[in-house]
């Protein structure tokens, strides 16, 4: 049978695939030995691509492997991370250091929470002053691009029509601790230290107060809407997770007390298809739950070596969980095996982390972003290889308590104890 000539580049590609497979399977020391021997030109990410290619070759003839290597559908299109196939995907999206501040809004107290709407058009921020602001991303970009002389000559009416803050909501009597946009309706949910969950209808310009609320027994720490919008997960200072029907306010909890955390819940998030949700807690555990039965499927004990879990979110394809902890480390977990595939280290080198913050994906899941508490800068890693990228100085005058990235565009919001929220964006050359 005719065989194509194998060149040096082919062998280098083979060695990279072997290293990636060893890393994926957990043979770190063997992989490092091979890396030291081969010295590949680029960083190898954990990947199962070699196994898939071998299976294709065994199922078909020996030309199938060569065919699969060049096949477009074996490479992720850049819309999300998938380590089974995309070890060699070239990242096209901008890294964090290329973003710039486009707009700054101020509260009258520390700003510690923000959230994006599903379409990326709106951002809500919450503060210790008990207020909530809703901002329009397009207006923020337009405002930042507007010449000073044009801005100075705006009438009061024009300024109001073009102002990025489209709503300011007041109905809590203590710090706003968590926010979530309804997936389909113009409704914003908020949780607070005043023990209430409130629902605001922001479709009405005159609306300042909530139209519904739920009285909780503890301070709320994290909320997440079911993708249908009919239910909302609530994590509080109490270790028992709640699920509410937002129409009837009926509360559901797992029928097995052993499913619950043993300390306050810091993070709750649904996956896109709603068949799972994930929680992180001060008890150091990450729990994966069945979205239908409300039962705990699995628990990752001491997920961050016993440190408090600050955040846990799903990747777009629901194959992975990205978590962060007070050990200043971000981790990528494979759900099917419960293993840590990638660790993102280097934040928090100047001192122990005191406050909670979040690790987030950028909109293409090419990068992981995590604020460094002491230096007030943003750490950035390649999501597949954990290669450190350039730091971004965040320009705040106090600790950054929250970061949220747009689900659709190269933009993110940072919230700080300096009372400010900064909107960052990477403009293209055509903007």
Swiss-Prot record:
Pfam families: CSTF1_dimer, WD40. The keyword GTP-binding does not apply. PROSITE patterns: WD_REPEATS_1 (PS00678), WD_REPEATS_2 (PS50082), WD_REPEATS_REGION (PS50294). Gene3D superfamilies: Cleavage stimulation factor subunit 1, dimerisation domain, YVTN repeat-like/Quinoprotein amine dehydrogenase. Its main location: nucleus. It is found in: Nucleus. WD repeats lie at residues 106-145, 171-210, 215-254, 260-301, 303-343, 395-431. Keywords: mRNA processing, Nucleus, Repeat, WD repeat. N-terminus mediates homodimerization. This is Cleavage stimulation factor subunit 1. It comes from Rattus norvegicus. The gene is Cstf1.
